[in-house]
UniProtKB/Swiss-Prot annotation:
The keyword Hydrolase does not apply. The keyword Electron transport does not apply. CDD domains: RRF. This is Ribosome-recycling factor. GO terms for biological process: translational termination. Keywords: Cytoplasm, Protein biosynthesis. The gene is frr. It is found in: Cytoplasm. One of its GO terms (molecular function) is ribosomal large subunit binding. Its main location: cytoplasm.
Length: 185
């Protein structure tokens, strides 16, 4: 039972780190990255659809993205979705593809993006700590119910603390990498 609690906590913490990593890919860095369009939705036959499912996105140059819709009829819808998103980019339509040039970020904008990245990292760490707290509560309940001895529970709590510290460090590392990426000119 103790192993199940620790395993479940570790699985959930791994998922949280992955979610944080995914969340950070949506922050614009000044370099072309197809992942920045992950959250952009366009109306496709009346259904909001991610533009990443409606087109192929390639990076021909470090600061340019090419978006080639699978159906030419969806070109205008994708263009409008990108314009209306909060990415701060303006696509140009040449009839075949959309070209999106990524403008250089200003120093002030970079600092705002770093703050945003740190906030997302903090959200990830809070989620990990909440998972730890839930695991600790489950361990204490096991001990209270008499299903596990005090020594076993204390050892499991130490293990859970160690695992938690490792995952918090992973989130810090992911955020630090993103911060470094953002501050590169």
């Amino acid at each position: 039972m103790i192993d199940e609690i620790l395993f479940e906590a570790e699985e959930r913490m791994t998922a949280t780190v992955e979610h944080t990593r995914e969340d950070l890919t949506t922050i614009r860095t000044g370099r072309a990255n197809p992942a920045m369009f992950n959250g952009v939705m366009a109306e496709y036959y009346g259904v909001p659809t991610p533009i990443t499912q409606m087109s192929s996105i390639s990076v021909p140059e470090p600061r340019m993205l090419l978006i080639k819709p699978y159906e030419m009829s969806s070109m205008q819808v994708i263009e409008n979705a990108i314009r209306n998103s909060d990415l701060g980019v303006n696509p140009t339509n040449d009839g075949q593809v959309l070209r999106v040039t990524i403008p250089q970020l200003t120093e002030e904008r970079r600092k705002d993006m770093v703050k945003l990245a740190k906030g997302k990292g903090e959200d990830g760490k809070i989620a990990i700590r909440n998972i730890r707290r839930k695991g600790m509560d489950q361990l204490k309940k096991l001990q209270k119910d008499g299903d596990a001895g005090e020594d076993e529970v204390q050892a499991a709590e130490k293990e859970l603390d160690k695992v938690t510290a490792g995952f918090v460090a992973q989130v810090d590392e992911v955020v630090a990498r993103k911060e470094k990426e953002l501050m590169e000119v």
